[in-house]
Regions:
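Surface-exposed binding/hinge segments that line
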Residues: 88, 122-169, 173-194
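Structural transition elements
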Residues: 186, 317-355, 369-376
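Ligand-site clamp/hinge motif
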Residues: 209-261, 391
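Periplasmic-binding protein-like
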Residues: 287, 291-330, 376-377, 482-492
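Extracytoplasmic/peripheral linker and loop segments enriched in polar/acidic and small residues
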Residues: 342, 388, 393-407, 432-502, ...
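Long beta-strand-rich cores associated with HINT superfamily self-processing modules
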Residues: 500-521
Length: 521
């Protein structure tokens, strides 16, 4: 039985729904992957960040246009010379264990986050002193003006600056915490956690939402359900059938070929997940041959036919070509002119393989088997590389296992890797300060570990630009350098659709699913 037939099965359509009382009190959500870790600072993948937004809160939150707004903060004051920022916490904030949220908890949380996050590292380089003046006041004393301070604290994806109790935040950043206690709108239930399969949460009755309307990660995080369940269903067809029968309320990413079926069903709805979209790309491991040779990375970039990759993950109206190192459509992003495709490009790539010293050694491509927006792109990469004459060794596994292997710096034959397909929500790679995909600072870089001093100098020029004109000039020059340095090879920009029960209202558009503002009509 194929997926469409499965969805139309009379047995499934006739399956009894949960009792109305239980359904009214419980929100059942199927994320893009199974939750296997609890620390969104140590493991900033989308699924762990989704969990993080449930359990933890942030000092500032970003709206759909990525503008920062106070969240845990009541507000802030900036000195006349722009070198001292004083952030005041809202009154009455408490952690799930009952302890009050204090400024020293936030200071410890910011420090731990900044060790692992690129934007955080840039912020701390500009910070001479970070301290708690009293229980409700956080003080940044800067070495130089840093107008993007609130943008750093409000970044909505790929390691948001979540606030934790000091006892957790004081733990080393290179080791994950195993206790999920925050001050967010949901309380994690450790006794019901099955790594990779399911997680459960209770509404935080002590949570004090802001008065403003909810928008993305900003505004009032009002929870109207008593209980939240995250359930991972590996098969997309089974998940869609469960949505149609009411066994689950929301699927983060339905399979693209099932979206038309869900749109036709009066009991289900779909909408664009995040209007800013996702940039797909191929990541190279620059530590080892042959992709430590930039000439080969350029050649592989130029044989990627983006429509092939995009058609595999999104509906025709939901993707576009994007020959850029930042998501197309965002401010100051400039596309490069793609090289001539076809036979000539393939011949150039084969020549580049020879020049890089490739002699038929196995090239390890790691690919998740349970993440449709990545899985199909990875398989297309494998096919492309084989057509170039590369001896491909394919490692497909669940997303959590691939994430663990991706972090392994060992040689490919000893548990490491050469190639990896993935994507980034536009908000998490929107500019040089937040983008983990373009940084080229060697061992400190995102897995792939590329190194290019010129790129890093230009990132610094953007961050330290004294005015808008200088920042725009720095951005233009940086994109030129990145296109030649090739830390990633873009495969296109696409917008995914999310699917939910028609009686579920208040689904927000954001880089992550925001599990508040939801009601059952």
């Amino acid at each position: 039985m194929d997926r469409r037939s499965l969805l139309m099965s009379p047995a499934l359509l006739a399956a009894p729904a949960y009792a109305q009382g239980a359904r009214a009190r419980t929100l059942r959500f199927m994320p893009q992957a199974g939750l296997s870790a609890l620390d969104p600072i140590f493991n900033p993948t989308t699924i762990v960040t989704t969990h993080g937004f449930c359990v933890f809160d942030t000092l500032y939150g970003a709206d759909r246009a990525l503008r920062p707004h106070p969240q845990m903060a009541a507000g802030h004051e900036v000195s006349a010379d722009a070198l001292t920022w004083r952030i005041t916490l809202r009154e009455g904030l408490r952690f799930h264990d009952g302890d009050p949220v204090r400024a020293r908890d936030c200071v410890a949380s910011i420090r731990r986050w900044a060790v692992r996050d690129g934007f955080g590292q840039v912020l701390m380089q500009a910070t001479a002193e970070l301290s708690a003046a009293d229980d409700r006041t956080i003080v940044f004393r800067l070495r130089r003006p840093f107008p993007a301070l609130l943008d750093a604290l409000a970044k909505p994806g790929s390691s948001p600056c979540f606030m934790m109790p000091e006892r957790l935040a004081s733990q080393p950043a290179d080791r994950p915490i195993t206790e999920a206690v925050g001050s967010g709108p949901w309380k994690f239930l450790p006794g019901e956690f099955v790594p990779g399969a399911s997680a459960a949460y209770l509404r935080n009755e002590r949570y004090i939402p802001r008065d403003e309307p909810a928008e993305a990660a900003a505004g009032g995080k009002r929870v109207h359900f008593d209980r939240l369940e995250l359930t991972w269903i590996p098969d997309g067809g089974t998940a869609a059938a469960a949505l149609r029968t009411g066994e689950i309320d929301w699927i983060e990413y339905p399979l693209p070929d099932l979206v038309p079926v869900l749109d036709r069903d009066r009991n289900t709805k779909t909408q664009i997940y995040d209007p800013n979209g996702f940039l797909g790309f191929l990541r190279f491991n620059c530590l080892y041959p042959p992709f430590n040779d930039v000439r080969l990375r350029r050649a592989i970039r130029d044989v990627i036919v983006q429509p092939d990759f995009m058609q595999a993950v999104a509906l025709p109206q939901d993707w576009q070509e994007c020959h850029a190192m930042f998501p197309c459509g965002l401010p100051n992003v400039v596309e490069s002119t793609p090289a001539t495709r076809g036979v000539a490009a393939m011949d150039r790539a084969r020549a580049a393989l020879r020049e890089a010293g490739y002699r038929g050694e196995p090239i390890v491509h790691i690919n998740p088997s349970d993440f449709p927006a990545v899985t199909q792109q990875g398989r297309l990469t494998v096919d492309l590389m084989r057509r170039l004459g590369v001896n491909m060794e394919v490692v497909e596994s669940d997303w959590a296992t691939i994430i663990a292997r991706r972090a392994n710096r060992a040689p490919p034959a000893q548990g490491g890797w050469n190639l990896h397909n993935t994507n980034g929500p536009a908000a998490t790679i929107a500019n040089p300060a937040v983008s983990w995909a373009i940084r080229m600072h060697g061992a400190a870089a995102w897995p792939g570990w590329p190194e290019d001093a010129g790129v890093e100098e230009q990132v610094a020029a953007w961050v330290q630009a004294p005015d808008v004109a200088a920042q725009e000039a720095a951005m233009k020059k940086l994109q030129e350098l990145l296109w030649e340095a090739v830390p990633i090879a873009p495969t296109g920009l696409f917008r995914l659709r999310t699917a939910f029960r028609a009686d579920l209202t208040g689904v927000l558009q954001a880089p992550n699913p925001m599990l508040w503002n939801l009601r059952r009509s």
